[in-house]
């Protein structure tokens, strides 16, 4: 039996170093702006005494036989202090951990053999204590060292067990033996005082379950079980448990009955599942989980707050939510006050808004782009950068052609669809919602295209396109109209594809369902030359833009990327071992998302949060997202080619470059996206075919099958019986599933996220709410006279209020920003990929394709023929350029949903 032995130490004097361990288990939401002051060990004793790396080693008793000495280095990443934590380092913890270093007991490591012994049992582990050695000045990482005496017959080392002897958890980057054998950890290791279980880390070599070395099989299963939990109790900050729950925590009925919200997830309101936290239920609603207090729970390895730069998205988002928004609310106290003049909107960029910093004003230090100090004053100014849409052309938002162009090359390219049937018909019950047939007629179309062709020819030649928010919004119109300060319609917007390949609008239909004895009201607006109808047309566009903004945020963005991805993350951690090749392929695409989603539930999508207070559906926003999930979401349509085909924006064509032919040739999002999709799929194909050379390996992989089953039946339980779920029997099945997940977390999310400030930062271009009804809907004499007297005032009153606009602008600025340490797709190679030559080569080819894509997009943006992506004053389409600098750049595709 191997026993650790402590040799007589060599005393070495060292200057005290800041501890590499965090002061508390703090998720992102525990951020304070108070600067963290680390208490120096020097206050306890004047000299730091440590053991050299040769002091502590595991030795073999002489009677056992020969052994090999192996040197081990443990690399620990320091945590970020300052604005990232609310708790200063406690003296007790500092002294206790320093004593651990003094005694040479920082980490207990145990090497595990991949082989069984001659009797078929697992071999004894080889143990050693690692103690602090130095701070690497170049990498700024802490090094701990020890030596092992490994028996000659130990066999190949396959895993290492780690126990953290300190009182605080530590983020361990890697463990290296003899500078050759590497265990990539990138994981928080809890203190044994919080959890006595040892952490398990495997070599960088990937194994299918059937190929697992005999000596590691039980550890592989044990490690998975440690991540699943038992579904009971409240999760603690040091836990690594991944489990499922419904969205039963966005309401706050204990504070106010009007803040109660229905549970999302279940037969009544289908929705993907989130990570379970186990908090107690509310006292007023036993089915609703109580609102969280800071910090909120995410599995420990999903919390990157203390190890990423201060400008990491979650940090800055937190700073806006808990620093800027309260400051704005204290200044803009009249919640109903709009902008009296367009000039007042301009001043947001020229002068900004003076704000009183909150008591904990350090949060604002994370926002140098937004918040500027005022000379000789304690006040600060919230000054917005001019968005590109306004900087390039101040009047572009007013033009019809730009209104249409942005459906192809703007922030929400996921809604436009081909018209395939005429007349346009609603699928809603006419007994409840009124006549189903649209008021946009054949004559309307022919009048607008001025005899260029008949309506039948336009339909046959695929010239008619639609934004259709009629059936999704109409059931909410009467309910939303009961809320003061907002209104809603069902809407349809019809567009025509011109001979130059651009779109122009033909008509907008706004509909109000029957209510309180009033019949259905609907009206068709068209581009006009006379003053009155032209202003009605502009107001109708404002309503449609508010609908599109809401759909973009609640469906294209939140639902189809953030929300549906969380079950993928949970299932991947619960069912795929850390040594599984698919786990390692997906890992970079699944980082950071759960932390962002937790913050969204805390302050963005919650009752009376940013979304509910600033978007047209108000308190019904998340129910609308649930309806979209029930009616529209299909996994098999989330791959880009399938999405385009489902909307009629492409047809299958084996002779076309991507296997599909676009209905609109100059569709910037689709053209760039298909190149990125192909690159992702080719990378996934090479990777999967390497590990699964035969189809039977896919079907017989019990971890893989359990993973896919759990995604379908638990993570997306409300869709579990749908016939469209792909099977997982062949390599092609697996390539399709994995490529879709990789695309959604990278390309899809980037396309709908990183242009938010460029397009929405000037809110007349994308208002989030329409506050007033159309002037011609049952007008009073006074209302109509006010419109006729000064229609500009009516438009400004329809736009968001000052507090609504500035809150959203501040949020969009952060959501659109890349951090300096952003991990762009194809720019960093996972250690497990590099360890396998064939995978390393495939990844390098993937990187090469992405670099070509970057150049291709630049070339396309210089082509004057492509009018939908370039032209005088246009914001060129570059959202799918893979690489970017930091800040708000309007380009760059991170691996994952990192903000």
From Swiss-Prot:
PLAT domain location: 83-203
Keyword Cytoplasm assigned to the entry: answer is no
Q: Name one GO biological process term.
A: lipid oxidation
- Gene Ontology CC terms: chloroplast
Q: Which GO terms describe its molecular function?
A: metal ion binding; oxidoreductase activity, acting on single donors with incorporation of molecular oxygen, incorporation of two atoms of oxygen
Cofactor(s) essential for the protein:
Fe cation
Q: Which Gene3D superfamilies match?
A: 3.10.450.60, Lipoxygenase-1, Domain 2, Lipoxygenase-1, Domain 3, Lipoxygenase-1, Domain 5, PLAT/LH2 domain
The record, for Pfam families, names: Lipoxygenase, PLAT
Where is this protein found? Plastid, Chloroplast
Q: What CDD domains does the database record attribute to this sequence?
A: PLAT_LH2 (cd01751)
Q: What class of enzyme is it?
A: oxidoreductase
Q: Which domain of life is it from?
A: Eukaryota
Listed EC numbers: 1.13.11.-
Q: Which residue stretches belong to region Disordered?
A: 252-286
User: How the cofactor binds, per note?
Assistant: Binds 1 Fe cation per subunit.
Q: State where Fe cation binds.
A: 557, 562, 749, 753, 899
Which pathway is this protein assigned to? Lipid metabolism; oxylipin biosynthesis
**Domain called Lipoxygenase: residue spans:** 206-899
What is the recorded function of this protein according to its Swiss-Prot or TrEMBL entry? Answer: Plant lipoxygenases may be involved in a number of diverse aspects of plant physiology including growth and development, pest resistance, and senescence or responses to wounding. Catalyzes the hydroperoxidation of lipids containing a cis,cis-1,4-pentadiene structure.
Family that this chain belongs to: Belongs to the lipoxygenase family.
Q: What is this protein called?
A: Lipoxygenase 2, chloroplastic
Q: Which gene underlies this protein? A: LOX2
């Amino acid at each position: 039996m191997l026993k650790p032995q402590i040799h007589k130490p060599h005393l070495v004097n060292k200057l005290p170093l800041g501890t590499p361990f965090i002061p508390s288990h703090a998720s992102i939401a525990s951020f304070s702006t108070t600067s963290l002051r680390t208490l120096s060990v020097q206050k306890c004793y004047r000299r730091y005494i440590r053991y050299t790396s040769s002091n502590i080693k595991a030795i073999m008793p002489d009677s056992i036989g020969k052994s090999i000495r192996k040197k081990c280095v443990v690399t620990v990443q320091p945590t970020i202090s300052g604005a990232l934590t609310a708790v200063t380092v406690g003296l007790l913890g500092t002294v206790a951990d320093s004593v651990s270093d003094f005694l040479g007991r920082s980490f207990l490591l145990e090497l595990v053999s991949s082989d069984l012994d001659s009797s078929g049992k697992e071999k004894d582990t080889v143990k050693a204590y690692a103690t602090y050695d130095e701070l690497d000045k170049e990498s700024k990482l802490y090094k701990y060292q020890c030596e092992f005496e490994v028996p000659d017959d130990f066999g190949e080392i396959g895993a290492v067990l780690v126990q953290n002897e300190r009182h605080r958890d530590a983020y361990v980057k890697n463990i290296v033996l003899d500078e050759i054998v590497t265990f990539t950890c990138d994981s928080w290791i809890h203190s044994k005082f919080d959890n006595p279980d040892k952490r398990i880390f495997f070599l960088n070599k990937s194994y299918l379950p059937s190929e697992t070395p005999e000596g590691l099989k039980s550890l592989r299963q044990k490690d998975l079980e440690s991540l699943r939990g038992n579904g009971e109790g409240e999760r603690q900050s040091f836990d690594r448990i991944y489990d499922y729950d419904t969205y039963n925590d966005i309401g706050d009925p204990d504070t106010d009955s009007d803040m109660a919200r229905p549970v999302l997830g279940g037969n009544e309101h289908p929705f993907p599942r989130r990570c379970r936290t186990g908090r107690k239920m509310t006292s007023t609603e036993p089915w609703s989980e109580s609102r969280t207090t800071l910090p909120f729970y995410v599995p420990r390895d999903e919390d990157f707050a203390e190890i990423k730069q201060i400008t990491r998205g979650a940090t800055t988002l937190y700073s806006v939510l808990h620093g800027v928004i309260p400051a704005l609310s204290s200044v803009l106290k009249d919640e109903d006050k709009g902008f009296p003049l367009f000039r007042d909107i301009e001043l947001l960029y020229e002068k900004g808004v003076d704000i009183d910093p909150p008591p904990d004003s350090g949060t604002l230090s994370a926002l140098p782009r937004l918040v500027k100090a005022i000379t000789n004053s304690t006040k600060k100014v919230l000054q917005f950068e001019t968005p590109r849409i306004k900087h390039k052309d101040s009047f572009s938002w007013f033009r019809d052609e730009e209104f249409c162009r942005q459906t192809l090359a703007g922030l929400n390219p996921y809604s436009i669809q081909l018209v395939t049937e005429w007349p346009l018909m609603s699928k809603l019950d006419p007994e409840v919602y009124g006549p189903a047939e649209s008021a946009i007629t054949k004559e309307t179309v022919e009048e607008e295209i001025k005899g260029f062709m008949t309506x039948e020819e336009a339909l046959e030649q695929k010239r008619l396109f639609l934004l259709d928010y009629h059936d999704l919004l109409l059931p909410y119109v009467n309910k939303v109209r009961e809320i003061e300060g907002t209104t809603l319609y069902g809407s349809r917007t019809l567009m025509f594809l011109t001979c130059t390949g651009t779109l122009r609008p033909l008509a907008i239909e706004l509909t109000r369902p029957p209510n309180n004895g009033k019949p259905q009201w609907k009206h068709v607006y068209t581009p006009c030359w006379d003053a009155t109808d032209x202003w009605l047309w502009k107001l109708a566009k404002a309503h449609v833009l508010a609908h599109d903004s809401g759909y973009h945020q609640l469906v294209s963005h939140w639902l189809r990327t953030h929300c549906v991805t969380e079950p993928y993350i949970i299932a991947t951690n619960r069912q795929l071992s850390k040594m599984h090749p698919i786990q390692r392929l997906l890992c970079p695409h699944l980082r950071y998302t759960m932390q962002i989603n937790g913050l969204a539930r805390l302050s963005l999508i919650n009752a009376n949060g940013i979304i509910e207070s600033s978007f047209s559906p108000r308190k019904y926003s998340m129910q609308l997202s649930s309806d979209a999930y029930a009616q529209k979401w299909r996994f098999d349509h989330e791959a880009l080619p399938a999405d385009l085909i489902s909307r009629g924006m492409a047809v299958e064509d084996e002779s076309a470059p991507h296997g599909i032919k676009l209905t609109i040739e100059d569709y910037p999002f689709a053209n760039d996206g298909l190149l990125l999709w192909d690159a992702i799929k080719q990378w996934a194909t090479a990777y999967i075919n390497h590990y699964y050379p035969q189809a039977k390996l896919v079907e017989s992989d019990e971890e893989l099958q359990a993973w896919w089953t759990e995604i379908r039946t638990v993570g997306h339980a409300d869709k579990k019986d749908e016939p469209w779920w792909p099977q997982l029997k062949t390599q092609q099945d697996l390539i399709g599933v994995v490529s879709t997940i990789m695309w959604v977390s990278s390309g899809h999310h980037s396309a709908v996220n990183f242009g938010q400030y460029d397009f929405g930062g000037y809110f007349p271009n994308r208002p989030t709410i329409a506050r007033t009804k159309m002037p011609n809907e049952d007008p009073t004499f006074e209302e109509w006279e006010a419109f006729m007297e000064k229609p500009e005032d009516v438009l400004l009153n329809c736009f968001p209020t000052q507090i609504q606009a500035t809150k959203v602008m501040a949020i969009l600025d952060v959501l659109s920003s890349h951090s300096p340490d952003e991990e762009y797709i194809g720019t960093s190679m996972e250690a497990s990929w590099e360890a396998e030559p064939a995978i390393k080569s495939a990844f390098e080819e993937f990187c090469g394709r992405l670099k070509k894509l970057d150049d291709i997009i630049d070339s396309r943006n210089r082509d004057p023929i492509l009018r939908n992506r370039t032209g005088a004053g246009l914001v060129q389409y570059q959202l799918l350029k893979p690489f970017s600098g930091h800040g708000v750049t309007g380009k760059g595709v991170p691996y994952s949903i990192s903000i």
